Amino acid sequence: MYRNQYDSDITTFSPSGRIHQIEYAMEAVKQGGAAVALKSKQFAVLVSLKRSSSELGSYQKKIFVVDDHVGIAISGLTADARMLCNYMRNECSNYNYVYESQMRVERLVTKVADKHQVHTQRYGRRPYGVGLLVAGYDQLGAHIYQTCPSGNFYDYKSISIGSRSQSAKTYLEKHFESFEECTLEQLITHGLRALRETIPNTDDTLNSKNVSIGIVGEGQPFKIIEEADAQPYLNLLENEEPVEMQTN
């Protein structure tokens, strides 16, 4: 009843206490490509499913390096994500210049969440239509955070966002207790398994072209693994499938 009256203004609440533009931005995140994040004591891993606009087009980049100790996976509008990524890079660079040390991951996430929030309150702006999964490592250990267009952010042991992310969450909820002691290779394998759950068609599979992996941890600067470099992890996933079938 009230939706048409209030869904074009970011500064006005509807009578039911909702801001529809924020809900639309959240929907953009839900419709984006799936991304999974998980961590152990020493490492944090991002795994993302890349999409291609057509058979003639290349796959869109979904994981970005922010600094040596932190990176992001995105779901939603890539252009908005690029703006936020540049903002995060500038914040890390400025902090490093002033303090000659790396910014703590939580502080960086708080800053980008505040930037999200400004666009939910000021007239003439729209919310960023993108959700971020932030993976980082600092003196406090490995971290996984999720940011939302609403300006909220959350700390997780493991999480997934994007299209059909609930299937990946179900896998993560069943196995997250074992993640803490996992090696980097095992953590990546769990991430790929969770991401595989988001693929609806049995004819589609994870391959080196549509998968992107980001890793960071103790003694490991943030690194993106794609194309041929990702194939060994996909091979490991395929080799473990018959074992799963036998144990079931």
UniProtKB/Swiss-Prot annotation:
GO CC annotations, alphabetized: cytoplasm; nucleus; phagocytic vesicle; proteasome core complex, alpha-subunit complex
Keywords on record: Cytoplasm, Nucleus, Proteasome
One Pfam family matching this protein: Proteasome
Source species, domain of life: Eukaryota
Keyword Thylakoid: no
Stored InterPro entries: Ntn_hydrolases_N, Proteasome_alpha, Proteasome_alpha-type, Proteasome_alpha1, Proteasome_asu_N, Proteasome_sua/b
SUPFAM superfamilies, alphabetized: N-terminal nucleophile aminohydrolases (Ntn hydrolases)
GO BP of this protein: proteasomal protein catabolic process; proteasome-mediated ubiquitin-dependent protein catabolic process; ubiquitin-dependent protein catabolic process
Primary localisation category: cytoplasm
PROSITE patterns in the cross-refs: PROTEASOME_ALPHA_1, PROTEASOME_ALPHA_2
Family: Belongs to the peptidase T1A family.
Task of the protein: The proteasome is a multicatalytic proteinase complex which is characterized by its ability to cleave peptides with Arg, Phe, Tyr, Leu, and Glu adjacent to the leaving group at neutral or slightly basic pH. The proteasome has an ATP-dependent proteolytic activity.
Designated name of the protein: Proteasome subunit alpha type-1
Organism expressing this protein natively: Dictyostelium discoideum
The organism's taxonomic lineage, starting at the top: Eukaryota, Amoebozoa, Evosea, Eumycetozoa, Dictyostelia
Gene behind the chain: psmA1
